[in-house]
Amino acid sequence: MPTINQLVRKPRKSKIEKSDSPALNIGYNSHKKVQTKMAAPQKRGVATRVGTMTPKKPNSALRKFARVRLSNLIEVTAYIPGIGHNLQEHSVVLIRGGRVKDLPGVRYHIVRGALDTAGVADRNKAVLNTGRNVQKDNRRGIRENES
């Protein structure tokens, strides 16, 4: 434990909070050609490379990723979620924060259905099971076995 005199000479430093997605906290002034402190929830970018990579040790797969040059001139690696995608080089994409735990260096996700990225094809929403025997063509949800 430090003495009062030691704390007077050298005060305690507060912890610096590190961002999980630092590229989203930087803007770019193209007129002055300088980076600015302008945070954003998403950023637009151009895919410079689209490919697959293998995950860390216990998992095994081919995860799809894209290398993206953002509008603030920072280049990041972003994960392409969902089954199948239509991204190519020079596709304009929207990225959001959020890492992929088993892919080292991937701290961003591409937003499906925004800009050049198509949504996931043939994706079905889960049907809530209410415990009733309802026929498929019975659209109003009236019970079948009522008399």
Swiss-Prot record:
Domain of life assignment: Bacteria
Record flagged with keyword Nucleus: no
Keyword Transcription regulation applies: no
Family matches, as CDD domains: Ribosomal_S12
GO biological process, one term: translation
Keyword vocabulary terms for this entry: Methylation, Ribonucleoprotein, Ribosomal protein, RNA-binding, rRNA-binding, tRNA-binding
Modification 3-methylthioaspartic acid occurs at: D102
Pfam families per UniProt: Ribosom_S12_S23
InterPro entries the record matches: NA-bd_OB-fold (IPR012340), Ribosomal_uS12 (IPR006032), Ribosomal_uS12_bac (IPR005679)
A molecular function GO annotation: tRNA binding
Region feature Disordered, mapped onto this chain: 1-22
Gene3D superfamilies: Nucleic acid-binding proteins
GO cellular component annotations of the record: small ribosomal subunit
Cited HAMAP family: Ribosomal_uS12_B
Purpose of the protein: With S4 and S5 plays an important role in translational accuracy. Interacts with and stabilizes bases of the 16S rRNA that are involved in tRNA selection in the A site and with the mRNA backbone. Located at the interface of the 30S and 50S subunits, it traverses the body of the 30S subunit contacting proteins on the other side and probably holding the rRNA structure together. The combined cluster of proteins S8, S12 and S17 appears to hold together the shoulder and platform of the 30S subunit.
Subunit: Part of the 30S ribosomal subunit. Contacts proteins S8 and S17. May interact with IF1 in the 30S initiation complex.
Family as reported in the entry's similarity comment: Belongs to the universal ribosomal protein uS12 family.
Name listed for the protein in its UniProt record: Small ribosomal subunit protein uS12
Species name: Streptococcus pyogenes serotype M12 (strain MGAS2096)
